[in-house]
A protein has these predicted regions:
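Glycine-centered tight turns that cap/initiate beta-strands
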Residues: 70-73
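Charged, solvent-exposed interaction patches on well-folded alpha/beta domains
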Residues: 1-27, 39, 43-52, 59-63, ...
Length: 234
């Protein structure tokens, strides 16, 4: 009896997989996509107007969609009798990484996932100095992203939009450049808190020397900051 039931189930599946009743036609809903287009999702999933929803491999389709550089996760659901629902979760860049061949988007997890092209949004902090790939470069990138995450926490004097560039030297030292301050802030190998940087900037504004500041060294000494000025104070 069990063998007969199994055989009957196979026959029913095979029959349903050929019925026009289960063809999706244009009944495909795509959700969550902004960067990747609907047409790209459909093409990568392999679904078309002749696709039978019973025979369609939803797991394979999701895996195919996830090969797109901007897609972090894809899920495909059947809505019987003849509709498919595709949910997309796209990567969210937090920085741009400068390489010899161009700029690349980087997400919070440190994945370098897509090259920026003409017309793309470039309003992200720029990470420079990390030229190579591999474990060492990944470690430098992780430290840079941790610093950016710290800086991007809002502060009245230090808004998240203020970060322009974070340069990483070969030995891992970091130098920060802000949008409204033309001088570099050397962070060195340390990871100063956002409040530490903001406190230094507040002092420069309060003493009205922000305009003549040449550089700031946040790692000059233990609990000491070195501020170099373009002109000496009178």
């Amino acid at each position: 009896m069990a063998a007969m039931a199994g055989g009957l189930g196979t026959l029913l599946y095979a029959g349903a997989a050929r019925l026009d009743f289960f063809r999706v036609g244009d009944g495909v809903e795509v959700e969550g996509n902004q960067r990747i287009t609907r047409a790209e999702v459909l093409m990568m999933s392999g679904v078309d107007v002749r696709t039978n929803i019973i025979a369609f491999d939803t797991i394979q389709a999701a895996a195919a969609i996830e090969k797109h550089p901007w897609v972090s996760r894809a899920r495909v659901y059947r809505d019987l009798p003849n509709r498919l629902r595709i949910k997309i979760e796209e990567r969210k860049p937090i920085a741009l990484l400068s390489r010899d061949d161009g700029l690349y988007y980087v997400d919070r997890a440190g994945a370098v996932f897509a090259q920026a092209g003409g017309g793309d949004d470039l309003d992200y902090p720029l990470i420079t100095g990390i030229k190579n790939e591999g474990r060492a470069a990944a470690g430098l990138l992780d430290r840079a992203l941790a610093m950016i995450s710290t800086i991007r926490r809002n502060d009245p004097i230090f808004p998240r939009q203020s970060l322009s560039e974070l340069h990483v030297d070969r030995d891992g030292e970091q130098t920060l450049y802000l949008v409204n301050t033309p001088f570099p802030l050397r962070l060195g190998h340390s990871r100063p808190r956002q409040g530490d940087i903001a406190a230094v900037l507040k002092q420069l504004y309060r003493r009205k020397v922000i305009g003549i500041t040449r550089s700031v060294d946040m790692e000059y000494g233990r609990d000491r900051v070195l501020v170099r000025l373009k002109t000496p104070l009178v």
